Amino acid sequence: MSFRLSERSRARMRGVHPALVGVIEAAILITPVDFMVTEGLRTPALQACLVRAGASRTLNSRHITGHAVDVAAMVEGAIRWDRPLYPRIAEAITTAAKIKGVVLVWGGDWPRLRDGPHFELDRRVFP
């Protein structure tokens, strides 16, 4: 089954690095689990607010530079946060990245505070 990005997801990627946008656009065509983009570019003020609220742990987020997106799984039109859905989405996104020659980091692979919805361009390649 092939899914497509909603206009809302596309709008949320405004200001995101074109390489990452291209990966997400390719991944939606091959993912076994539908997803939407929940967030892309953030202002430093919003990031500081998220840190104060405990929703983020860093003021140095890749969202601030447009090098990260967060996604949410969609099942029958509803957002789902079930952990088993996110490795399936990640497989599609990382496959699309490899095809496009883009080096990504998936938050679900982090040793501390795993963040399954988070994908960012690798700092070593995209400073």
Predicted regions and their residues:
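Active-site acidic/histidine clusters and adjacent loop/turn architecture
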Residues: M1-M36
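Extended, low-complexity, intrinsically disordered C-terminal regulatory tails
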Residues: E25-A53, I99, L104-G107
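Short linear motifs at secondary-structure transitions and domain/linker junctions
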Residues: R10-R14, P44-L50, T94
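Catalytic cores and adjacent binding grooves of peptidoglycan-active enzymes
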Residues: R57-P127
